[in-house]
Amino acid sequence: MPLSRLIINDFRNITTCDIQLSPGFNFVIGPNGSGKTSVLEAIYLLGHGRSFKSSLTGRIIRNDCDELFIHGRFTTPELFELPIGINKQRDGTTEVKIGGESGQKLAQLAKVLPLQLIHPEGFELVTDGPKFRRAFIDWGVFHVEPAFYDAWSRVKRLTKQRNALLKTANSYRELSYWDLELAQLSEKIDQWRVDYINHISEATQQICQAFLPEYDIKLSYYRGWDRETPYAELLKKNFERDKQLGYTVGGPNKADLRIKVAGTPVEDVLSRGQLKLMVCALRLAQGQHLTEATGKQCIYLIDDFASELDSHRRQLLAQYLKQTKAQVFISSITAEQIADMHDDESKMFEIEHGKIAQG
């Protein structure tokens, strides 16, 4: 469902704004420091409960204010409005409302508002550590497998408990009871991840062929331990080593998605502009699979659209985004950079010093 309305209060340099949105393309135009990224950041906060720019709540609440508030409205397929909102206070308190009901969990907010973010720091998905690619995989599994969230939360708790027990256990018998459940859930999570990567690999490669036809890009999934070894067996076999180290070496918390060109990691082959298109291909493939699997559309947030992309590559990306028929929010310094994407159904907003007006 696309957002039909967005209200922002006391977020960053934005005192207040209340805008009606297009179900298609929404452009936020303004000079550096004007607050255009803050609009996208507010939408991200509404769907994730956190900022993609700062982990400190105090830094995203407007100066001299005690709290921020972000409110959104959807128009459902049945044509009734569903309100959602998030309130954050300087003391760290967070309140989430869905359909007017308080006390909702952030995971429920994420289910209602599936978001894909493409921003200048987004190269981390392919260039940095495995945790970013695990988060990428798990975003997709979370949205298509209802049992994933609880299972993964349980695995993380069990692993933490196991690591604590490793410091005091004298024999493996003291861990065997906990390891039984940990192994069963870990194998289940692994299978969900395998299925998910299998589903999006073909779509990713097709989009990469359009964006980067000169490269044959391959995805491969590493589950976090040897493919031939059951996890229960690994936990037992590695007990002495894990005890010596003080933590569990292998497991689903070590999974990774390996992205290569002719056997070489993509970050060693592609330019920054090409890496951005690679990230876009992954995000678009995720959105495509979400729609195919659930009927939902994700919302795309693209900060600094022109960054690292020449006009030809911008046109390619814009073409694919239009084909998705998803709602898209794009920030840009000038209207000229997005002129060929603007149509009768899109909306353009101009922002300066935190004040927003429809262009």
Swiss-Prot record:
<keyword id="KW-0235">DNA replication</keyword>
<dbReference type="GO" id="GO:0005524">
    <property type="term" value="F:ATP binding"/>
</dbReference>
<dbReference type="InterPro" id="IPR018078">
    <property type="entry name" value="DNA-binding_RecF_CS"/>
</dbReference>
<dbReference type="GO" id="GO:0003697">
    <property type="term" value="F:single-stranded DNA binding"/>
</dbReference>
<dbReference type="GO" id="GO:0006302">
    <property type="term" value="P:double-strand break repair"/>
</dbReference>
<dbReference type="InterPro" id="IPR027417">
    <property type="entry name" value="P-loop_NTPase"/>
</dbReference>
<keyword id="KW-0547">Nucleotide-binding</keyword>
<dbReference type="GO" id="GO:0000731">
    <property type="term" value="P:DNA synthesis involved in DNA repair"/>
</dbReference>
<dbReference type="Pfam" id="PF02463">
    <property type="entry name" value="SMC_N"/>
</dbReference>
<dbReference type="InterPro" id="IPR003395">
    <property type="entry name" value="RecF/RecN/SMC_N"/>
</dbReference>
<keyword id="KW-0234">DNA repair</keyword>
<dbReference type="GO" id="GO:0009432">
    <property type="term" value="P:SOS response"/>
</dbReference>
<dbReference type="GO" id="GO:0006260">
    <property type="term" value="P:DNA replication"/>
</dbReference>
<keyword id="KW-0742">SOS response</keyword>
<keyword id="KW-0227">DNA damage</keyword>
<dbReference type="GO" id="GO:0005737">
    <property type="term" value="C:cytoplasm"/>
</dbReference>
<keyword id="KW-0238">DNA-binding</keyword>
<keyword id="KW-0067">ATP-binding</keyword>
<feature type="binding site">
    <location>
        <begin position="30"/>
        <end position="37"/>
    </location>
    <ligand>
        <name>ATP</name>
    </ligand>
</feature>
<keyword id="KW-0963">Cytoplasm</keyword>
<dbReference type="InterPro" id="IPR042174">
    <property type="entry name" value="RecF_2"/>
</dbReference>
<protein>
    <recommendedName>
        <fullName>DNA replication and repair protein RecF</fullName>
    </recommendedName>
</protein>
<comment type="similarity">
    <text>Belongs to the RecF family.</text>
</comment>
<comment type="function">
    <text>The RecF protein is involved in DNA metabolism; it is required for DNA replication and normal SOS inducibility. RecF binds preferentially to single-stranded, linear DNA. It also seems to bind ATP.</text>
</comment>
<dbReference type="InterPro" id="IPR001238">
    <property type="entry name" value="DNA-binding_RecF"/>
</dbReference>
